[in-house]
Amino acid sequence: MAESLSLEALRRHFSHLPQGLLNHLERVSQLARQLAARWEVNPERGALAGFLHDVARAEDPAWLLAQARELGLVVHPVEEAVPVLLHGPLAATQVERELGLKDQEMLAAITWHSTGHGGMSRLEQVVFLADKLDPEKEGYYPGLAGLPALAEEDLDRAVLRYIQWQINHLLEQGGMIHPASIEAHNDLIRRTRGR
């Protein structure tokens, strides 16, 4: 349960991960805590989900695909082509099994932090954006200057802006777009219409 988890316990449990990834997990955890407090989400849940979102990110793409199949996860054709997208669902499965995390909203935030999905909760949006706002990724997402300020003003619009950028970027690169991202886009258009 989330109540029994602490960042210190998570740091010990995942100390085997590469240092660069651990640093990212710490930054995202801190950003998620701050965004959660701003948007009246439990900051501790934000910090914990932020730390856990990428615990399977260092795994080889072939392993991610094989592991997803072995666990019986539904693998979308886009995930078959781009197995790195499975690191969120596999991280959620891992923390549920290894740590006993049962908080479904936290597990969803971990699962969907790469693609988003329709009907995202505030916690899911917080973790999604905290991952994208990691200062070490600055410059990685050209055209998204101002996203941190927007995340403080309107969480829905900030997530929408990132997802629109992501979809456009993938289209320009000839990449595949996960249907969950399209569902997130359409849902956020509906939510923000008229604002």
Question: Model-found features: residue ranges?
Answer:
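Short, low-complexity, intrinsically disordered N-terminal peptides in bacterial proteins
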Residues: 1-12, 190-195
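Long, amphipathic alpha-helical surface segments
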Residues: 155-173
